[in-house]
Amino acid sequence: MQIASSPFTHNQRSTRRIMLLVILACIPGIIAQTYFFGYGSLIQVMLAMITALLAEGAVLQLRKQPVMARLQDNSALLTALLLGISLPPLAPWWMIVLGTLFAIVIAKQLYGGLGQNPFNPAMVGYVVLLISFPVQMTSWLPPLPLQGTSVGFYDSLLTIFTGYTHSGENIHQLQVGYDGISQATPLDTFKTSLRSQPADQILQQPIFGGVLAGLGWQWVNLGFLVGGLLLLWRKAIHWHIPVSFLLALGGCAAVSWMIAPQSFASPMLHLFSGATMLGAFFIATDPVSASTTPRGRLIFGALIGILVWLIRVYGGYPDGVAFAVLLANITVPLIDHYTQPRVYGHKSGHK
């Protein structure tokens, strides 16, 4: 008899179908990200998926596992997708290959494959790249309305593989907006500018021209929010983690903002910038590395939300979703141990 590994679900849908549903739910966010930041994200995702399938197939072959059966569970594709859309669109090709190899081979297969990994593989790959190559990992283009140079599919492909567009511009030149000023993400801009300006002056910059948050980034987050609500509606994920994540992050941001509005970002900026919605619905809800009890999921999600706020405000990185998820993964055994539902009729006794 062969027993399948986790993740297990309460319904009869296979792991393959659930993974595919999560991939499809990412589409609204990917469309928004492609519109505002170019085709580079699609190229990164394709490179990551090819690398993930080849790497997982090779490791499964070495482990004498059924290659095609394991590859068809779509878990490698989902890991690749999450990593691909997390990287700057025009990051060098070798970075996505390296990050994907680390995610699949080290963070997933080294622990025994799907259902055995204690950490989210995509976030392990992301953090390895962020620590090793911080400059490349923060080289985001300005959103479409602020771009000084339009970057099409061909130029995106050339920049990823050669470092230059067909006209000879590199990534640093492409980062310069229409106003001649090098652009950064809203969270990065806010955090850096706070050293010399009050918040109300910072928010006058064009990058903060969105209704909810940063220009472009608010639509990316809304896209992933739509996909996340689809997953909740289809019962592919539990509500506990994303709700507690967003409430904790929004609560911390609201309290600090009300106390010192000139020193802290507003709750809306935190909720609709960076990887907030992607993290809440697609990353933190990983059924393998997240808590498995109802109360545990609430604690797990809230812990991630608090850690994201702490890292964004006091840490060395503008966005803290990846670090927060991995730190929370460490606490899962402890959380699950103390939040196990009590068996009906069970009474604690003494020897």
Swiss-Prot record:
Keyword tags: Cell inner membrane, Cell membrane, Electron transport, Flavoprotein, FMN, Membrane, Phosphoprotein, Translocase, Transmembrane, Transmembrane helix, Transport
Transmembrane segments: 18-38, 40-60, 87-107, 121-141, 211-231, 241-261, 264-284, 298-318, 320-340
Superkingdom of this protein's organism: Bacteria
Record localization: Cell inner membrane
SS bond list: none
Modified residues (FMN phosphoryl threonine): 185
One GO cellular component, as annotated: plasma membrane
Keyword Ion transport on entry: no
Catalytic class of the enzyme: translocase
Membrane topology annotation: Multi-pass membrane protein
Protein's GO biological process: electron transport chain; transmembrane transport
Known cofactor(s): FMN
E.C. numbers: 7.-.-.-
Function in brief: Part of a membrane-bound complex that couples electron transfer with translocation of ions across the membrane.
Family: Belongs to the NqrB/RnfD family.
Subunit structure: The complex is composed of six subunits: RnfA, RnfB, RnfC, RnfD, RnfE and RnfG.
Name this protein carries in UniProt: Ion-translocating oxidoreductase complex subunit D
Organism for this UniProt entry: Yersinia pseudotuberculosis serotype O:1b (strain IP 31758)
